Amino acid sequence: MSKTLYSFDFDDTLCHTPDHIEGKKQWEKITGLSWPYNGWWGKAETLDSDVFSVQKNEWVYQRYLDAVADEDAYLIMATGRLKKIVGMRENIDKILNQHNLSFDEVHLNWGGDTFIFKTRLFEEMIEKTGCEHFVMYDDRHEHLIKFEEWASEHHVDVTIVDVIKKEETKYKNI
């Protein structure tokens, strides 16, 4: 049983991945081709390390190292990137490996709304690990607000870390 379950989001939390505006410019510059799709986040090519140099978020990385040093910890990465997209998992794994980021489990969205995916996953992981404390790192403001509501409904202590503001909110639960 792990006392603390840590969850790290991927895009703009662990790593500074390209957004659709700068990413499309970079794609065209490196490949000489126009971006061939309408969407961005659902495409494995957005994480192609031959095109993009994805850097880790140093502030989050320091917290990741603290979590790794916690002997009673279980670490997961949870991303809204879709599992069913060919090449997505491989590209994410390549970026994680480039930055020596290792997790007990890596989870990609099985489909649908990212917030719903993550809350269901977190509930499963809290049950699986039997943790006393759940710590999550994320960057999406609209999700963080909903995660705060979600946190108050659980029997474990929850810490939500807003990696943009570099603030954490703790919820003591019984």
Predicted segments with their positions:
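Alpha-helical substrate-recognition element adjacent to the catalytic core
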Residues: 3-115
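C-terminal cap/substrate-recognition subdomain and adjoining C-terminal extension
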Residues: 2-5, 71-74, 81-174
